[in-house]
Amino acid sequence: MNTIAPNLDGKHLRIGIVQARFTNEIGSEMLKVCCRTLQELGVADENITVATVPGALEIPIALMNFASSEKFDALIAIGVVIRGETYHFELVSNESGAGVSRVALDYNIPIANAVLTTENDAQAIERIEEKASDAAKVAVECANLVNLLLEEQFEDEE
């Protein structure tokens, strides 16, 4: 059996991050943690590009434009959706998540989805460190995996 080991070496990877500004205090902290973790994994600061958008529903369009540029090995979505008193929470959560997944599959690019969906601010704050750090690790690991699989695919065609 062939097994591909996880590779968390971010050296030479280019990462795009889209952060929703709605609930910006939490999102900004997530962005800091995410960027710090990427750098700890070896991603050069000049290889990290950050764009901000108004809210979670706008994340997929920015990700799509990053993906279509073919300048990135992986992308990261950062944001916070906190339940209110209306159905709007479900709409935003579901549509944002579906859009992120659609971009990843349509453009064959790994996207780490760190859009938190919580009941309140306290739950979101509690998850900042873990979820933002995890997103960086997922992006690096999946970028390396996809790059390796693409290399093997092209080697097989030769």
Curated annotation (Swiss-Prot):
User: Per the record, what are the reactions this protein catalyses?
Assistant: (2S)-2-hydroxy-3-oxobutyl phosphate + 5-amino-6-(D-ribitylamino)uracil = 6,7-dimethyl-8-(1-D-ribityl)lumazine + phosphate + 2 H2O + H(+)
Gene Ontology, cellular component aspect: cytoplasm; cytosol; riboflavin synthase complex
Question: Which pathway or pathways does this protein act in?
Answer: Cofactor biosynthesis; riboflavin biosynthesis; riboflavin from 2-hydroxy-3-oxobutyl phosphate and 5-amino-6-(D-ribitylamino)uracil: step 1/2
In which domain of life is the source organism classified? Bacteria
Top class in the EC scheme:
transferase
Q: Name one GO biological process term.
A: riboflavin biosynthetic process
Query: PANTHER family, alphabetically?
Result: 6,7-DIMETHYL-8-RIBITYLLUMAZINE SYNTHASE (PTHR21058:SF0), 6,7-DIMETHYL-8-RIBITYLLUMAZINE SYNTHASE DMRL SYNTHASE LUMAZINE SYNTHASE (PTHR21058)
Name the job this protein performs.
Catalyzes the formation of 6,7-dimethyl-8-ribityllumazine by condensation of 5-amino-6-(D-ribitylamino)uracil with 3,4-dihydroxy-2-butanone 4-phosphate. This is the penultimate step in the biosynthesis of riboflavin.
State the protein's name: 6,7-dimethyl-8-ribityllumazine synthase
- Species whose genome carries this gene: Neisseria meningitidis serogroup B (strain ATCC BAA-335 / MC58)
Classification lineage: Bacteria, Pseudomonadati, Pseudomonadota, Betaproteobacteria, Neisseriales
* Gene coding for it: ribH
